[in-house]
């Protein structure tokens, strides 16, 4: 008799979203969760299938998943994602798009369940080893991980692929076979198809031993988290930036550990040792009058006022003007800068009937702002207000006609100050 144990100790939430590709692993997971729901009628179970559009069979896989979910009475969400070349490689990009879709689909109070198993854990460990990862990377996957404000659960992580297949055959489950899984040009497929069978032939318990090593690495990381918690608290500001002064007296090893944890808190990719060295040498230790910047995909690390900042890369908008003909409705800004709106109640005067409204990102001449004596150029105001250089040509400036009224969240000009109680506020949702 085939025994398969779903780690139900993870299932404290009664609302579960199961990732369902239609393959063997996710079919077994969904079947197990359906059985769990039968024993616990208060459980709400949904499934999500991601249509990557990479295979000519993708549409038929959707139909298969719909059929299975209809039979098991599981509501199914199908999300279609578009994969553009972002330099990450197709595997990494597909994974990124997949998890972004998961995060957007999760409902309040719902947890995400995925079907990774012991063999997957072994593959993940070996891929991290190939990259030269330290204990954090070698920790591989946890059974429970924070994700999108909730939890990502892997209830099958202790089970082997062979056990899952035996369970599926015994219960007459049907699943799809993704032809790309047979392409050993992909690193993970190479391990699964060629390397691991040889290792397991010599050492049958190799995956279980690797999983134990991953667990030990994870324990070491948790211990480091505890030991470095006080240092991390001292270094991180209320804005989430990293103060450099405490790092200057630390050993290289301790400083690197703090940098890694700060980046993890900012949801940054795990940096390599070379990347950490570049952050320190090229950004943190750049000359005082420099504005150093190091790019990581669509993000960058900058230094300002003796702090490190992890920010989204945005092109300067100093030549951009966005007309706002209907100022009573929100206005979308370019370059992913969000939206602005004018809401009742505030210290800005409303535009007069003859005044056109626009958003710009530069302002010439001498400006007079509320709360300051004398006039200043915009560059001087940015400096006085502590606005980082990269925000100075991406912060929305509200104009009525050719008159600057306000900078979102920073200042109001005297010409823009409300003259009565009918004022408005400029709200920027970045």
Curated annotation (Swiss-Prot):
The keyword DNA damage does not apply. Its EC number is 6.3.4.19. Keywords: ATP-binding, Cytoplasm, Ligase, Nucleotide-binding, tRNA processing. It catalyses: cytidine(34) in tRNA(Ile2) + L-lysine + ATP = lysidine(34) in tRNA(Ile2) + AMP + diphosphate + H(+). It comes from the Bacteria. It is an enzyme of class 6 (ligase). GO terms for cellular component: cytoplasm. It is found in: Cytoplasm. Ligates lysine onto the cytidine present at position 34 of the AUA codon-specific tRNA(Ile) that contains the anticodon CAU, in an ATP-dependent manner. Cytidine is converted to lysidine, thus changing the amino acid specificity of the tRNA from methionine to isoleucine. This is tRNA(Ile)-lysidine synthase. It comes from Salmonella paratyphi B (strain ATCC BAA-1250 / SPB7). The gene is tilS.
